[in-house]
Regions:
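N-terminal domain-start signal
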Residues: 1-210
Length: 210
């Protein structure tokens, strides 16, 4: 009952998702121009036609538009949620903040420019704004790790024993391990839904392993 209103509103948002026929049309598109044209007919249009993207390549415009759209969806779901349920929902959404951190650390490892990657960061509001700004601005992996000091992510990497010695994989694995262990613990707090949550997590973990 407590989540009834929120659940109804979130279900209504499903109408904005692309239908099977739209996804199939995109999959069969002959080029990026056709993909862009098809997406302009969907709920992604407002993000695609943003003036700030005009000088980007079509591929970058699509990726950035999808990032903005998804960030907005996360914020809306959180806003619709009952206050006493938001901490749990934020914990689930933490997956996307960890993906942000992994993306940024990997970009430092590959020596990609800040300009190339910063528009692909999802806005979750979990990592303090200052820490995220420092992570984005970091010149290399070590500076990026320093930006995370004082956060659970730095502690997770430290506890795992992972170190950066030219190989980024141990750091990324430590962050994934932190999230999945946390989710398994959280699932135990909801006995009636534990099996469903653990099944979902198992599917995600299996997909990650594949």
């Amino acid at each position: 009952v407590k989540l009834g209103y929120s659940n109804a509103r979130v279900k209504a948002m499903k109408a904005l998702l692309m239908q099977k026929r739209e996804i199939e049309a995109i999959a069969e598109a002959k080029n990026i121009e056709e993909v862009f044209s098809l997406l302009e007919k969907t709920s992604y249009r407002p993000d695609l036609i943003s003036g700030t993207l005009a000088e980007k390549t079509l591929a970058d415009q699509i990726e950035i538009a999808c990032t903005k759209n998804f960030s907005r969806t996360l914020r809306k779901i959180l806003k619709l949620s009952p206050p006493d349920a938001r901490a749990s929902i934020m914990s689930v959404f933490e997956k996307y903040e960890i993906e942000n951190i992994k993306l940024l650390l990997t970009s430092k490892h590959l020596k990609q420019s800040k300009e190339k990657i910063q528009n692909l960061v999802l806005e979750t509001g979990i990592l303090p704004r200052g820490a995220m700004s420092r992570l984005i601005a970091a010149k290399d992996v070590m500076e990026g790790l320093a930006a995370l000091e004082g956060t659970p992510y730095a502690s997770a990497i430290e506890k795992s024993g992972a170190k950066y010695e030219g190989n980024i994989t141990p750091l990324l694995a430590a962050l994934d391990d932190y999230y999945y262990k946390k989710m398994q613990q959280m699932a135990k707090q909801f006995p009636g839904e534990e099996r469903a949550m653990l099944k979902m997590l198992k599917s995600v973990i299996d997909a990650k392993n594949i």
